[in-house]
Amino acid sequence: QTGQAVQASFGYYIFPLVAIIFGYIFKGERFSKIQIFAILCAVCSIVTLGFALRLVPTFSLIIAVTFGAYGLIKSFTKLSSLESVTVETMVLAPVAFSFLFFNYSLQGQENYTAIRPDFWLLMVSGLITGGPLILFAFATKNISYATVGILQYINPTLQFLVATFIFLEPFNTWHAFALIFIWIGIIIYSGESWRLELRR
């Protein structure tokens, strides 16, 4: 709504790197040389996107660091996935509802049954978001945080494909190179993680 959609999507590309760094610093996770190469491929994709978008990703970094910290905290909590998401929802729901009603009141729309459809879509989107958050919380407790990070490239990549092929947004050579680097990194990292798991 503020014209920062590109930076927002860029932030979700940076987040996996933040998750990997946090896993290394705060959870003592270590990587094989092959995994380090995969991580460097991901770094190359971020640099490539930066050149493609020609921007200083201030908002992107804020999104990446805050969501990375959120996931790290989740990985240390003792609550189950469902319990932790339920607590978060109970705390944030009143704030979200108050903001929505206040915002629409400022627009002179006190009759909420007559509010345009996007208001109700926002209300329902919270329920739809709950499922992925529960699965995310489950993942942070059951696999390494670095692996959580590298798998997070799937989400922005799918968003990117939707934007390109459904919304017909521009797709250039820089974007293609970035996607190639990202998926090379994902395949190498996942393959190496699977190999190491079989050796244990």
List where the protein language model places each region.
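Hydrophobic transmembrane alpha-helices of multi-pass small-molecule transport proteins
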Residues: I34-G50, I63, W174-S193
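C-terminal transmembrane-helix exit sites in multi-pass transporters
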Residues: Q1, I14-I34, T157-A176
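Hydrophobic/small/kink-forming positions within alpha-helical transmembrane segments
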Residues: P16-I21, G68, F97, G126, ...
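Helix-helix packing/entry segments at the starts of transmembrane helices
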Residues: S9-I14, S81-V91, G130-F165
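Membrane-interface helix-cap regions at the ends of transmembrane helices
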Residues: A42-L55, A93-P117, T164-L168, Y189-S193
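C-terminal-most transmembrane helix of multi-pass membrane proteins
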Residues: Y153, T157-R200
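Hydrophobic alpha-helical transmembrane segments of multi-pass membrane transport proteins
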Residues: I62-A69, I73, L106-T147, I187-I188
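Transmembrane alpha-helical segments that form core, pore/gating elements
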Residues: G50-G108, R200
